[in-house]
Amino acid sequence: MNKKTLVSGITSTGKLTLGNYIGAIRNFVKLQDEFNMFIFVADLHSLTNEIVPSVLRKNIKEIAALYLACGLDPEKTVLFKQSDVYEHGLMQWILLNQTTIGELSRMTQFKDKSSKITHANNTESIPSGLLTYPTLMAADILLYNPNLVPVGQDQVQHLELTRKIARKLNNKYNTKFNEPTTFVPETGAKIMSLTNPTKKMSKSSDDINGTIFLLEDPELAYKKIKKSITDSENKVYHDPSKPGVSNLLEIYACLENKSLKEAQEIFKDKNYLELKEGVGNSVKNFLTKLQAKYQENYKRVDEILNQGKIKAQKVASYNLNNLMKKIGIRDK
């Protein structure tokens, strides 16, 4: 039976967090035996932000090494750098001409991010890449014609646009693009800030105390858990009215490979101090082991990214050439 294909990328801005691991990377590791997987470091997407070249280079290698340390197997998963596969840019140009300015300017993420780019004199200089970002994302996806694309809630609208573009190409040019779906894991789909558990833990946030970074001192991470916001009830159970406690239970369940029900059972007669100690120790142990693996994998990042580039380019080139033949810019 042919395996289905999964594609996902992560921008090379900011430092990876525990939320990135639990919400995404952990699931990729579980799915790599079931799917043909293409996982990439989205360095081109990072260019819509202000960048420091030396920091960007460091982030790219760091993210790739962390993916490997978390358990991605380069024999099973194609791990590559987006900019290494030139087909992404050409595919974007083709897809850009299948969309309208109206469609792109209605994207919620564009409206949110562009509203924050205002100078002191009340003028704006919004990068055009911010507007066209969803078409590069669509190119990233359709080049590998996947069945499944795990995305966060903030990217669901972009995935819907990708599905719309695929449908349009299929109807217009008789192409065979899949309309990929996404999935949401049962536990840990969204890990929240430790200081404000109504907001997502994010690698782009300034909320340092509410965020656990995968490469930070495990002892510091333990202390952050100990100081995390809960509530005044002092009873441990998972409930929407208890976002802080629920968040800690989800972190524990995911790191210890237990169900939420099992996690609640473990802490049902415990107080919040005991809950935080249990979760804190789980986080500290996880980070200690992960960081040891990270050091081992960092040395082979360049080699693995180069191998991934070759494998990804083979698939991307094949699918792009087929599309170019269909639209008339390649001979059949």
UniProtKB/Swiss-Prot annotation:
InterPro entries in the record: aa-tRNA-synth_Ic (IPR002305), Rossmann-like_a/b/a_fold (IPR014729), Trp-tRNA-ligase (IPR002306), Trp-tRNA-ligase_bac-type (IPR024109), Trp-tRNA_synthetase (IPR050203)
Its main subcellular localisation, reduced to a broad class, is cytoplasm
Q: In the UniProt record, does the keyword ATP-binding occur?
A: yes
What stretch of residues is annotated with the motif 'KMSKS' region?
Answer: 200-204
Entry binding sites for ATP: 11-13, 19-20, 152-154, 191, 200-204
Q: At which positions is motif 'HIGH' region? A: 12-20
Q: Which UniProt keywords apply?
A: Aminoacyl-tRNA synthetase, ATP-binding, Cytoplasm, Ligase, Nucleotide-binding, Protein biosynthesis
State its Enzyme Commission number(s): 6.1.1.2
User: What is a GO molecular function of this protein?
Assistant: ATP binding
An annotated GO BP: tryptophanyl-tRNA aminoacylation
Annotated compartments: Cytoplasm
Which Gene Ontology cellular-component terms appear in the entry? Answer: cytosol
On whether Cytoplasm is a keyword of this UniProt record, the answer is yes
Tell me the disulfide pairings in this chain: none
Q: How does it assemble?
A: Homodimer.
Q: What does this protein do?
A: Catalyzes the attachment of tryptophan to tRNA(Trp).
Give the family, as the similarity comment puts it: Belongs to the class-I aminoacyl-tRNA synthetase family.
Q: What is the official name of this protein in its record?
A: Tryptophan--tRNA ligase
The gene coding this protein: trpS
